[in-house]
């Protein structure tokens, strides 16, 4: 992954609009870049395939957004990007990473659980949806600040022997 730039916003926005029912706006991405959030893109052959936005706050961070192009989903790209963002947070000495996800997003919930995130709570009626609203599940991943990086050994949620 590499740092997202203003020149990437159109491609990132296209992915966001294609995969999210209630997507971020161009302004949301520009604001994230302007506020110094950690914004990354994954590209292959000059084509952006995914993105992630992490907001650091003191010794914690919040994963604000992560998206994978529709044609690239279910190939491990989301997991790889999530791991890289956790690695970035770890290198910045963050103690934990928070996120929130729609209660109906079973694929994302499974990815986050298998990557070491645990349920923290529920925000009732947090997201808009076709029937009005739905809950957000808040999750946290505790990052251990040991001498080795998480990916050098075992990631949270993984067994030592795979």
Describe every region a protein language model picked out:
Residues 37, 134-138:
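Short hydrophobic/aromatic beta-strand or adjacent loop that forms the aromatic wall/cage
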Residues 3-75, 79-92, 125, 142-162:
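Acetyl-CoA-dependent GNAT
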Residues 82, 105-108, 125-130:
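Short glycine/proline-centered loop/turn elements that form peptide/ligand docking sites
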Residues 1, 101:
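Conserved SAM-binding loop
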Residues 112, 117, 139:
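Conserved active-site tyrosine of GNAT-family acetyltransferases
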Residues 68, 102-103:
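Short amphipathic helical patch at the helix-1/turn junction of helix-turn-helix
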Residues 89-100, 111:
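Conserved GNAT acetyl-CoA-binding A-motif
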Residues 98-100, 118-135:
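Conserved catalytic-core motifs of GNAT/GCN5-like acyltransferases
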């Amino acid at each position: 992954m590499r740092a997202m730039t203003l020149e990437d916003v159109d491609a990132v926005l296209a992915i966001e609009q294609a995969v999210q029912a209630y997507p971020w706006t161009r302004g949301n991405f520009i604001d994230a870049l302007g506020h110094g959030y950690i914004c990354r893109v994954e590209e292959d052959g000059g084509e952006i395939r995914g993105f992630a936005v992490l907001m650091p706050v003191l010794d914690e961070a919040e994963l604000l957004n992560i998206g994978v192009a529709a044609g690239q989903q279910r190939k491990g790209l989301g997991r790889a990007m999530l791991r890289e963002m956790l690695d970035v947070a770890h290198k910045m000495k963050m103690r934990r990473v928070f996120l929130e996800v729609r209660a109906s997003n079973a694929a994302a919930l499974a990815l986050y659980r298998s990557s070491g995130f645990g349920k923290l709570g529920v925000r009732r009626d947090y997201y808009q949806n076709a029937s009005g609203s739905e809950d957000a599940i808040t999750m946290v991943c505790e990052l251990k600040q040991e001498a080795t990086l998480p990916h050098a050994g075992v990631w949270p949620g993984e067994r030592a022997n795979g």
